[in-house]
């Protein structure tokens, strides 16, 4: 059974850093991960089985481009299922940095387990124990890297995430500390790992006849606070442009109105933009000292008949 293993080269420029794993054929059957090695909000672990089936529809394709790579799970599964294909993992969230520091994360969690001792699982951590936790985490931050997203799953209430020390200090702690080390052996092997704007990547590879785009953007209408991006409606719609004329696998959510919007536009193709040329007035309303919203009024008169 042939699989691809990788050696690493890095190419750096002021704005873009790429990390390419060059293919090297060896005789070894590697582990296939069914979930990302480190926690990642929105990874497609529940879709793994179905995704493998869908990949069989693209047996004639030779290049798979994971435009919104996230945790890299889709890229990893694709390479394991199609070792003959080129798989591009666009690591826009720098998940690779978290993997490279997995030993530091494991050491930090082991130290926190020693501090917590036999304290009951899932109980709130307060007082001197909480301060000891914070002191150990601060020490780690001064000497290197802290994976706050992974740390959050061991300390915070389910669904809560901190992205820095300041956010972590403001949240309640619970004894949910993972009892074993994280492992990521071979997870990125065989992948070409890059970091580009997805539009640039789509333009580069869209000219190849054997390409398939794997498209898992942030979901419209859902929490995207853990992503390293801030999206508006136009950004979600821009993603649809890369789908036109290319084979693709696209992911969205039942909470997202994007499919309803596309269906409506198909049923009303001639409407255009009803707000084109309209006047606009805005009003900012403040709910409290740190929360406000903006109301918008649009107005447009029709030409009077002669």
Please describe what each predicted stretch is.
Residues 1-4:
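Hydrophobic alpha-helical signal peptides and transmembrane signal-/tail-anchor segments
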Residues 13-59, 73:
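S-adenosyl-L-methionine
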Residues 65-78, 89-93, 153-158, 207-223:
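Conserved proline-anchored active-site loop of SAM-dependent methyltransferases
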Residues 80-84:
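Conserved hydrolase catalytic core segment
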Residues 86-188, 301-306:
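Class I S-adenosyl-L-methionine-dependent methyltransferase module
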Residues 173-179, 229-240:
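Well-ordered, non-membrane alpha-helical segments in soluble/globular domains
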Residues 194-236:
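Active-site segment flanking the S-adenosylmethionine/decSAM binding pocket
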Residues 236-306:
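Long, positively charged, glycine-interspersed low-complexity recognition regions
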């Amino acid at each position: 059974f042939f699989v691809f293993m990788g050696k690493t080269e890095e190419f750096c420029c002021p704005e873009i850093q790429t990390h390419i794993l060059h293919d090297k054929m060896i005789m070894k059957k590697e582990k296939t991960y069914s979930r990302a090695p480190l926690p990642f909000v929105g990874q497609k672990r529940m879709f793994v089985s179905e995704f493998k089936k869908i990949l069989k529809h693209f047996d004639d394709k030779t290049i798979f481009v994971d435009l919104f790579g996230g945790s890299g799970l889709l890229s990893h599964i694709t390479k394991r299922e199609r070792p003959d294909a080129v798989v591009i993992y666009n690591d826009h969230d720098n998940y690779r940095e978290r993997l490279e520091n997995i030993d530091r994360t494991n050491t930090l969690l082991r130290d926190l387990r020693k501090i917590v001792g036999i304290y009951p699982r899932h109980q709130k951590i307060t007082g001197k124990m909480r301060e000891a936790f914070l002191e150990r985490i601060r020490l780690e931050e001064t000497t290197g890297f802290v994976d706050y997203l992974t740390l959050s799953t061991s300390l915070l209430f389910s669904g809560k995430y901190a992205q820095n020390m300041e956010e972590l200090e403001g949240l309640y702690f619970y004894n949910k500390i993972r009892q074993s080390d994280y492992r990521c052996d071979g997870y990125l092997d065989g992948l070409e790992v890059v970091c580009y704007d997805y539009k640039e990547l789509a333009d580069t590879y869209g000219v190849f006849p054997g390409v398939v785009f794997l498209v898992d953007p942030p979901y419209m209408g859902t929490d995207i606070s853990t992503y390293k991006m801030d999206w508006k409606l136009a950004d979600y719609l821009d993603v649809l442009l890369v789908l036109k004329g290319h084979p693709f696998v696209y992911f969205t959510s039942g909470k997202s109105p994007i499919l309803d919007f596309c269906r409506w536009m198909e049923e009303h193709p001639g409407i255009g933009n009803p707000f084109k040329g309209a006047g606009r007035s805005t009003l900012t309303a403040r709910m409290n000292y740190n929360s406000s919203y903006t109301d918008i009024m649009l107005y447009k008169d029709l030409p009077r008949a002669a």
